Amino acid sequence: MPLFQNATFHISAHNLSDLPAPAGIEVVFAGRSNAGKSSALNTLANHNRLAFVSKQPGRTQLINFFSLGNDRFLVDLPGYGYAKVPEAVRKHWQLTLASYLSQRPCIGGLVLVMDCRHPLTPLDRQMLNWYSPSGKPIHALLTKADKLSRQAANQTLQQVRKELEASWGNCSVQLFSSLKKQGVEEAETVIGRWLFAPEDDVPDAVA
């Protein structure tokens, strides 16, 4: 049974003032619009509509918290990089996300979701620059791996791993496909390690 099988919606926030009081551990999912972030969350939770998968990139403009129980949360940040978002909205989210990532004390790790065909865009790099000074771990999901040949996907994986280690450190990276369910167990292992201390009993599904 997936580790996040029982994840449930907790709260949405438009501003930092709307965030719940810091408690427990939050694992944050970030990525460009249409990179497959919501699909990855849904796949990990084995829930088709846990994170809203919009046909229109950039539509979800809220920080969404999903509870795993025991003050453990998955946090879905708004997708970035959608050209049709008004400039005022873009600036609001730049400030909000930069502040959240750099100041939120209970973040346990960042999952950076990138389309494996277009990894490490300038906005992905900006996200890494905002977050990496925290010293907390980063795990990159190279999504839509089924769109590339195995050889091309593995070449991309090695290239991204090399650049992440050289430029930001404390990073891990993997291939992922929501369509083929590729990489689900690997992602669960990494995220579960962030959410639960070694002495904790990690259940098959978090209640």
Curated annotation (Swiss-Prot):
<dbReference type="InterPro" id="IPR030393">
    <property type="entry name" value="G_ENGB_dom"/>
</dbReference>
<feature type="binding site">
    <location>
        <begin position="58"/>
        <end position="62"/>
    </location>
    <ligand>
        <name>GTP</name>
    </ligand>
</feature>
<keyword id="KW-0547">Nucleotide-binding</keyword>
<comment type="function">
    <text>Necessary for normal cell division and for the maintenance of normal septation.</text>
</comment>
<keyword id="KW-0717">Septation</keyword>
<dbReference type="GO" id="GO:0000917">
    <property type="term" value="P:division septum assembly"/>
</dbReference>
<keyword id="KW-0460">Magnesium</keyword>
<feature type="binding site">
    <location>
        <position position="38"/>
    </location>
    <ligand>
        <name>Mg(2+)</name>
    </ligand>
</feature>
<protein>
    <recommendedName>
        <fullName>Probable GTP-binding protein EngB</fullName>
    </recommendedName>
</protein>
<feature type="binding site">
    <location>
        <position position="60"/>
    </location>
    <ligand>
        <name>Mg(2+)</name>
    </ligand>
</feature>
<feature type="binding site">
    <location>
        <begin position="176"/>
        <end position="178"/>
    </location>
    <ligand>
        <name>GTP</name>
    </ligand>
</feature>
<feature type="binding site">
    <location>
        <begin position="143"/>
        <end position="146"/>
    </location>
    <ligand>
        <name>GTP</name>
    </ligand>
</feature>
<dbReference type="InterPro" id="IPR006073">
    <property type="entry name" value="GTP-bd"/>
</dbReference>
<dbReference type="GO" id="GO:0046872">
    <property type="term" value="F:metal ion binding"/>
</dbReference>
<dbReference type="GO" id="GO:0005525">
    <property type="term" value="F:GTP binding"/>
</dbReference>
<keyword id="KW-0131">Cell cycle</keyword>
<dbReference type="GO" id="GO:0005829">
    <property type="term" value="C:cytosol"/>
</dbReference>
<keyword id="KW-0132">Cell division</keyword>
<dbReference type="Pfam" id="PF01926">
    <property type="entry name" value="MMR_HSR1"/>
</dbReference>
<feature type="domain" description="EngB-type G">
    <location>
        <begin position="23"/>
        <end position="197"/>
    </location>
</feature>
<feature type="binding site">
    <location>
        <begin position="31"/>
        <end position="38"/>
    </location>
    <ligand>
        <name>GTP</name>
    </ligand>
</feature>
<comment type="similarity">
    <text>Belongs to the TRAFAC class TrmE-Era-EngA-EngB-Septin-like GTPase superfamily. EngB GTPase family.</text>
</comment>
<dbReference type="InterPro" id="IPR027417">
    <property type="entry name" value="P-loop_NTPase"/>
</dbReference>
<dbReference type="InterPro" id="IPR019987">
    <property type="entry name" value="GTP-bd_ribosome_bio_YsxC"/>
</dbReference>
<feature type="binding site">
    <location>
        <begin position="76"/>
        <end position="79"/>
    </location>
    <ligand>
        <name>GTP</name>
    </ligand>
</feature>
<keyword id="KW-0479">Metal-binding</keyword>
<keyword id="KW-0342">GTP-binding</keyword>
